[in-house]
């Protein structure tokens, strides 16, 4: 039965590919390494699905190891002039340091978006690139919703687009549909779907706070919009988000909390999954030294790697030294402090085959920054985690990891060797974490369609139907007072109060009449 179903799905997929003419699709990637990796994979999948893909790539991003790949699709590169490029890179590094060690992360976040807005102005000013994109006459654009500039690019091109949300779906994140605040935690609240009374109070207050924060973030692009769009036709960013034909979400219900979704929202978490390859022999030899104890994989992402201080590296190295497991750590040798001796059970490398190591039978723990791509890879292979979240969606991802008993989270700023060691030992030795990880692995791998098939299938559907108007609820066009039924509530409240007032008046009048009648009879 299962084999028959699989053949039907494959046949349906092949038929769709044969019937659909190749479309010209633009993908946009202007953010950091993890975003590049994901959009690179999306572009490869669409190209492999029979479409003609062109990617707009900002070369100034932190993606040195991946830019050298031979792409199956065409790439349009752009970068700032050399004098400005260095200035922008220094500004970016200062902002990341400020976010890590400064007091006000919120104000630093606004500065980061102002940085992206300034970068956006440079891109929109490049007439050669914008004219080239116009000339290509794309059938569809697929953009990263974290890159707000891409919405302005699409508006300039006047093309239909699909939005890719690279992290967790949260209430009113980026124009996506809402869900009841009683069980849908607001982004940044640190809450799960199981809230007590005070948790629900916090959640609704966070809703108003997040709404303001979202408005403040969008306002950073105000000058960019005024500079590049004629007065009278200047778009509102929040309105542009609602124009998306589809929303692809880089998550899976093996990790995320269950919630209602609109028909134009599709979960495709796990796009980076690929066939497991044997690991290099030097890594296999290192792992074999530790026998049944196995090994720990450590990978903290590109942003965290930028701000790892000497003290943090020293504390982590000290904790690893007391583990019976071997430790494979993605850490550039150029970042390693000269006065810190590498623990004998630790091997550092500039790059490690993360997916292949997560699939290795001897892995016992994954120490991660909590980025969505890394978390989804760990879920796919059933590996427990210790998370050190720092930036963006990472804390929210680790809230879900902890809620599902897939691991434990600790803070980068307060990381100490002793507590870090105890946390790692707890996750390795307590079987409930491994049991939960294996259960999530089954959920993750038992979908009837792979994430790639879902992605291509829904893109083809949009191309065949000429858009997704049939998937968008009328709520997208309603004013907020109608959407939240405030006008109906006020009408019913007024009707109820009016009826009560009238009833009281009638009762008073009747009582007075009866009282007067009684007095007349007595007289």
Swiss-Prot record:
InterPro entries on file: UDP-glycosyltransferase (IPR050271), UDP_glucos_trans (IPR002213), UDP_glycos_trans_CS (IPR035595)
Intervals, Extracellular compartment: 23-487
Class in the EC hierarchy, top level: transferase
Annotated localization: Membrane
Xref: Gene3D superfamilies: Glycogen Phosphorylase B
GO CC, any one term: UDP-N-acetylglucosamine transferase complex
Pfam families listed in its UniProt record: UDPGT
Cystine crosslinks: none
MF term (GO), any: UDP-glycosyltransferase activity
Gene Ontology biological-process entries: cellular response to genistein
Family: Belongs to the UDP-glycosyltransferase family.
Function: UDP-glucuronosyltransferases catalyze phase II biotransformation reactions in which lipophilic substrates are conjugated with glucuronic acid to increase water solubility and enhance excretion. They are of major importance in the conjugation and subsequent elimination of potentially toxic xenobiotics and endogenous compounds.
Name of protein: UDP-glucuronosyltransferase 3A1
Species whose genome carries this gene: Mus musculus
């Amino acid at each position: 039965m299962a084999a028959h179903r699989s053949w039907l799905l494959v046949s349906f997929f092949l038929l769709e590919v044969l019937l659909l003419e190749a479309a010209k699709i633009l993908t946009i990637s202007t953010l950091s390494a993890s975003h590049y990796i994901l959009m690179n994979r999306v572009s490869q999948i669409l190209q492999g699905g029979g479409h003609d893909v062109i990617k707009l790539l900002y070369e100034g991003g932190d993606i040195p190891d991946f830019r050298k790949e031979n792409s199956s699709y065409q790439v349009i590169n752009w970068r700032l002039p050399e004098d400005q490029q260095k200035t922008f890179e220094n500004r970016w590094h200062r902002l990341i340091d400020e976010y890590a060690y400064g007091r006000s992360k919120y104000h630093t976040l606004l500065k980061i978006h102002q940085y992206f807005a300034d970068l956006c102005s440079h891109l929109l000013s490049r007439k050669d690139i914008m004219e080239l994109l116009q000339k290509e006459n794309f059938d569809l654009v697929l953009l990263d919703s974290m890159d707000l500039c891409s919405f302005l690019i699409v508006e300039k091109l006047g093309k239909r687009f699909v939005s890719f949300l690279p992290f967790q779906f949260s209430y009113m994140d980026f124009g996506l549909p809402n869900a009841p605040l009683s069980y849908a935690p607001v982004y940044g609240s640190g809450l799960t779907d199981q809230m007590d009374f005070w948790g629900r109070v916090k959640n609704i207050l966070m809703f108003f706070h997040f709404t303001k924060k979202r408005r403040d973030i969008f306002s950073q692009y105000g000058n960019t919009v005024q500079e590049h769009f004629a007065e009278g036709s200047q778009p509102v960013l929040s309105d542009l988000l609602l124009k998306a034909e589809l929303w692809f979400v880089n998550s899976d219900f093996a990790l995320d909390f269950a919630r209602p979704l609109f028909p134009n929202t599709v979960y495709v978490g796990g796009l980076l999954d690929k066939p497991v390859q044997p690991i290099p022999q030097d890594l296999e030899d290192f792992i074999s030294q530790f026998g049944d104890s196995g090994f720990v994989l450590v990978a903290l992402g590109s942003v965290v790697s930028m701000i790892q201080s000497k003290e943090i590296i020293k504390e982590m190295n000290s904790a690893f030294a007391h583990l019976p497991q071997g430790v494979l750590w993605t850490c550039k040798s150029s970042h390693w402090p000269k006065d810190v001796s590498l623990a004998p059970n630790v091997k550092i490398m500039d790059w490690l085959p993360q997916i292949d190591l997560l699939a290795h039978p001897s892995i016992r723990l994954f120490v991660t920054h909590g980025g969505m791509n890394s978390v989804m890879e760990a879920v796919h292979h059933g590996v427990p985690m210790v998370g050190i979240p720092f930036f963006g969606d990472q804390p929210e991802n680790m809230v879900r990891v902890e809620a599902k008993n897939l691991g434990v989270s600790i803070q980068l700023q307060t990381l100490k060797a002793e507590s870090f060691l105890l946390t790692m030992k707890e996750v390795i030795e307590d079987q409930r974490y491994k049991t939960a990880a294996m259960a999530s692995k089954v959920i993750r791998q038992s979908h009837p369609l792979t994430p790639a098939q879902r992605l291509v299938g829904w893109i083809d559907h949009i191309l065949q139907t000429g858009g997704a108007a049939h998937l968008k609820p009328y709520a997208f066009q309603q004013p907020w007072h109608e959407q939240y039924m405030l006008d109906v509530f006020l009408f019913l409240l007024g009707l109820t109060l009016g009826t009560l007032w009238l009833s009281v008046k009638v009762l008073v009048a009747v009582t007075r009449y009866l009282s007067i009648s009684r007095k007349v009879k007595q007289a």
